[in-house]
């Protein structure tokens, strides 16, 4: 079937030749009908010989010219085609040389842009780490504040700044996340409690408590740093859009897969917004005056979940709240996924 495709392509590209040769042969036949002295047997012999030689010529040309395009069809690198001299005709060599020059130029640009991106990532990473020092010092100063009301307000704003810095750091590291992952068995409960501790100043100001219920063995095979980032972003959203309600957090076991659910009783997500919640920079269309949301939290979660093998489910009702469920993979599923990624990279 594949050979028929190449034959069809070849005949289509040589159709003008074929029509011209047929025209010349029919022209000779037409002349023979006018000139009665022209021996008809000789003419048929000439036409038959001409068509036979044309068929042989087309076959030889087909096998010679289609070879290069079959290499293209197999996705061979242009460097291999050029260095192995797989182009047969002068036009093919010229085409291969042109493609080689263009692809080489584009590769140089890609390398240059990648270096710039790496420098940009390094600059932002260094900036975030540098600014963390005065932010940490600020926390020590806030802890010395004796006015509890003022202290609580300052801790609330400090927590927001610290969270935004962490988010920016993770956004910067998105491109290199594969190199930055280390899988091991870790406790979901421990990760959740650590993240709750980080948000306690915000939850206290907003009158939000946490109902934590871990019913099953909560150890999962994942990368602790990136998994905590996902939990942090989901908790941040739950806190951001809730007030004076408890957030329910717990684990369940379905088909040997541990799942973590985080349920809030906040404003909820409308049906028209639901398909777009993972888009970069998207914020709710229901509250256009909302200035505290950057639209990056769920984008980050969506960008990382596949690398961790996590299946994400979001259900929501406007005015009643949102439930986010993280379904964790088994260890062998992670190993299989990493093997596939490694094979693709080669």
From Swiss-Prot:
UniProt keyword Membrane present: yes
Top-rank lineage group of the source organism: Bacteria
Domain called Histidine kinase: residue spans: 126-332
Transmembrane segments: 15-35, 43-63
Record's catalysed reaction(s): ATP + protein L-histidine = ADP + protein N-phospho-L-histidine
SUPFAM superfamilies in alphabetical order: ATPase domain of HSP90 chaperone/DNA topoisomerase II/histidine kinase (SSF55874), Homodimeric domain of signal transducing histidine kinase (SSF47384)
Biological role stated in the UniProt entry: Member of the two-component regulatory system GraR/GraS involved in resistance against cationic antimicrobial peptides (CAMPs). Functions as a sensor protein kinase which phosphorylates GraR through the auxiliary protein GraX. In turn, GraR up-regulates many genes such as adhesins, exoproteins, transporters, toxins, and proteins involved in cell wall synthesis. Down-regulates the expression of many genes involved in RNA and amino acid synthesis or glycolysis.
Protein name in UniProt: Sensor protein kinase GraS
Lineage: Bacteria, Bacillati, Bacillota, Bacilli, Bacillales
Gene field: graS
